[in-house]
Curated annotation (Swiss-Prot):
Disulfide bonds: none annotated. Pathway: Metabolic intermediate biosynthesis; acetyl-CoA biosynthesis; acetyl-CoA from acetate: step 1/2. Catalyzes the formation of acetyl phosphate from acetate and ATP. Can also catalyze the reverse reaction. Homodimer. The active site is at 152 (proton donor/acceptor). Mg(2+) binds at residues 7, 388. Belongs to the acetokinase family. Mg(2+). Can also accept Mn(2+). It comes from Lawsonia intracellularis (strain PHE/MN1-00). Its cofactor is Mg(2+); Mn(2+). GO terms for biological process: acetate metabolic process; acetyl-CoA biosynthetic process. It is found in: Cytoplasm. The keyword Transcription does not apply. This is Acetate kinase.
Length: 404
């Protein structure tokens, strides 16, 4: 069964065609610069295999529909297309960032679900409205094929009130549903389940702290296989220091900046989302560049790295305290999977908590799930490559199969 997985942004979208249950990626691609004078599509057949072939197209895509039409043309291309017809696609899975309190599970997309995605756009306007554009494009170009929404926030709907409520007047929650929602849920769920499989134990028996560290960063406390707390909040701005996002700050900073700098609320929001974090401290948001600058004695780069590590350690300690018992720490995403220095610094000094990193294992690069703690470490440490597209494909197949 072939599942098309789509992740739509405001001016781009990524896609994969996955053959299930073999979990073989037949096609992956990216259409970007939608709405600009010149757009680009990169379309790969059998990616990351010896059979990989890449096709690049440069042309204007005025809308998401035009971009997806170009993808369809490649999928059924008489010379190198994977499909004879788009009717071979069993289902389409869409990543949707925000599902609010209503969407606790993946959902077959109908008008009601689209209305909820639109309503939740008040908390994530750029993401949710883009996802809607992707969904409506798929409905237009793939008629009769079921579409499924998989929400970033749904995994965290198991958090208790003590974790998700903000200590504001309760009426604000009642009236506006302002609370912690959390994000990266598809990734946190996937790597936790993969680790449970590796340990050959049921996920419902296991407690993990998952660290999704990329340009966007979040951590989750998982108790008996369920999220009980997570670092991102009402929006993805909360929590850890990130590439360009500030993470936790004193809320009083916002009105202070508006008053003193005469910036608008929108300007301050942009500053916190796009000009802060690692970039705000040292001018760089790529961790590889920061490591290089640190090696050259750049004090601000070193400060940015130290602040980044410090915040992760704070959350790790806090989540250990609320979990009580820990079956593993999991690193994932771009930095978590590939950055040996960050992992070493995060784990350094935590031996009294039962966390012992094995330097040799940590410095061994691999694209597979692996243990990087010592054999006698009371708490094992894992590196687990995330695969949100595969998780979306699995959940899509499961839902569509159960409803037919």
């Amino acid at each position: 069964m072939k599942v098309l997985v789509i992740n739509t942004g405001s001016s781009s979208f990524k896609y994969q065609l996955i053959d299930m249950p073999m979990e073989q990626v037949l096609v992956s691609g990216l259409v970007e610069r939608i709405g600009e004078e010149v757009g680009q599509m990169v379309h790969k057949i059998y990616p990351n295999t010896s059979q990989e072939k890449k096709y690049t197209t440069t042309q204007p895509f005025s809308t998401h529909v035009e971009g997806m039409q170009a993808v369809v043309a490649e999928l059924i291309n008489p010379k190198h297309g994977i499909l004879h017809s788009v009717k071979e696609i069993y289902a389409i899975g869409h990543r949707v960032v925000m599902g609010g309190e209503t969407m606790k599970h993946p959902a077959l997309i109908n008008q009601h679900v689209k209305n909820i995605i639109r309503e939740c756009a008040i908390f994530s306007p750029l993401h949710n409205l883009s996802h809607l554009a992707g969904i409506e494009t798929a409905e237009e170009l793939f008629p009769g094929i079921p579409n499924v929404a998989v929400f970033d926030s749904e995994f965290h709907q198991t958090m208790p009130k003590v974790a998700y409520l903000y200590p504001l007047p309760y009426d604000i929650y009642d009236d506006y549903k302002i609370r912690r929602y959390g994000f990266h849920g598809t990734s946190h769920r996937y790597v936790a389940q993969q680790t449970a499989n590796f340990l050959n134990r049921p996920i419902k028996e296991l407690n993990f702290i998952t660290c999704h560290l990329g340009n966007g960063c979040s951590m989750t406390a998982i108790k008996n296989g369920k999220s009980i707390d997570t670092s991102m909040g009402l929006t993805p701005l909360d929590g850890l220091m990130m590439g360009t996002r500030c993470g936790d700050i004193d809320p009083a900073i916002v009105p202070f900046l508006i008053e003193k700098t005469e910036k608008s609320a929108k300007d301050v929001d942009e500053l916190m989302n796009k000009q802060s974090g690692l970039k705000g401290i040292c001018g760089m948001n790529d961790m590889r560049d920061i490591h290089e600058a640190c090696a050259q004695g750049n004090a601000k780069a070193q400060l940015a790295l130290d602040m980044f590590i410090y915040r992760i350690k704070k959350y790790l300690g806090a989540y250990y305290a609320i979990l009580g018992h820990l079956d593993g720490i999991i690193f994932t995403a771009g930095i978590g999977e590939n950055d040996t220095i960050v992992r070493e610094k995060v784990c350094s000094g935590l031996e009294n908590l039962g966390i012992f990193l094995d330097s040799s294992r940590n410095n061994t690069h691999s694209s597979t799930l692996r243990l990087i703690s010592t054999d006698n470490s009371p708490i094992p440490i894992f590196v687990v490559p995330t695969n949100e597209e595969l998780e979306i494909a699995k959940l899509t197949i499961q839902l569509v199969s159960n409803t037919q």
